[in-house]
């Protein structure tokens, strides 16, 4: 009787361990990980992409669903703005009517959407929920959207970049022309000191030199104009 009782006691002792392993196994099998940007900044009138990606341990089927919700600032009320299940179902009511577009790909784990013609009234919290049965338990990440007007500083930086793109190539061309002029001038001085008599070909080169001088002066003048425009811009 004692020998028969030992195996039974061991079996009972293993029950809790097996139970823990079983539940851990279920957790791993049915895990669904979702990621989204915590903060997104956009500008009025410019399309904004809200990124959402997911990883599922199960194969993608037509049972997969995606839901995007919106919650205004300082409010507990949420509204559905997009639903996906084999097809796209953007909201047909509310402030986001006809402004939500699907830009994701479920087979690549992408559940992103885009907002067209955003305004500052769109500021708030957006949540992305994905279910891919049997993976239904997951986190629900939230994205804080901030929409603002493009400020003067942003516009100024664009103007500055454009000015640099125009100024630098012009400066390089002028420098190359000046170097070429300097080399030709040094060669002519050496020849004049040695009493070298110019041939008809060299006379033709001098004519070309005069043309190059005029071109160089014109380029220098253009560079000065660019410099003056650059200074007026800033």
From Swiss-Prot:
SUPFAM superfamilies: Immunoglobulin (SSF48726). Residues 180-234 are cytoplasmic. SMART domains: IG, IGv. Glycans are attached at residue 123. Residues 1-31 form the signal peptide. Residues 32-158 are extracellular. It is found in: Membrane. Keywords: Cell adhesion, Disulfide bond, Glycoprotein, Immunoglobulin domain, Membrane, Signal, Transmembrane, Transmembrane helix. Mediates homophilic cell-cell adhesion. This is Myelin protein zero-like protein 3. The gene is MPZL3.
């Amino acid at each position: 009787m004692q020998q028969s009782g030992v195996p039974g006691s061991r079996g009972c002792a293993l029950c809790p361990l097996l139970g823990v392993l079983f539940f851990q196994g279920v957790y791993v099998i049915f895990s669904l990980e979702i990621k989204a940007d915590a903060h997104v900044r956009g500008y009025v009138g410019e399309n904004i992409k809200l990124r959402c990606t997911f990883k599922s341990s199960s194969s993608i089927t037509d049972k997969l669903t995606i839901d995007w919700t919106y919650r205004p600032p300082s409010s507990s009320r949420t509204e559905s703005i997009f639903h996906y299940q084999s097809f796209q179902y953007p909201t047909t009511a509310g402030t986001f009517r006809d402004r939500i577009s699907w830009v994701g790909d479920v087979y690549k784990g992408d559940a992103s959407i885009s907002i067209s013609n955003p305004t500052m009234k769109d500021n708030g919290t957006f949540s992305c929920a994905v279910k891919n049965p049997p993976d239904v338990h997951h986190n629900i990440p939230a994205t804080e959207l901030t929409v603002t007007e493009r400020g003067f500083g942003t516009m100024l930086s664009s103007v500055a970049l454009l000015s640099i793109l125009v100024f630098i190539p012009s400066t390089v061309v002028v420098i190359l022309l000046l170097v070429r002029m300097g080399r030709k001038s040094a060669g002519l001085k050496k020849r004049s000191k040695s009493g070298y008599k110019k041939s008809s070909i060299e006379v033709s080169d001098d004519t070309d030199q005069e043309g190059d001088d005029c071109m160089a002066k014109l380029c220098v003048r253009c560079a000065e104009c660019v410099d003056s425009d650059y200074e007026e811009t800033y």
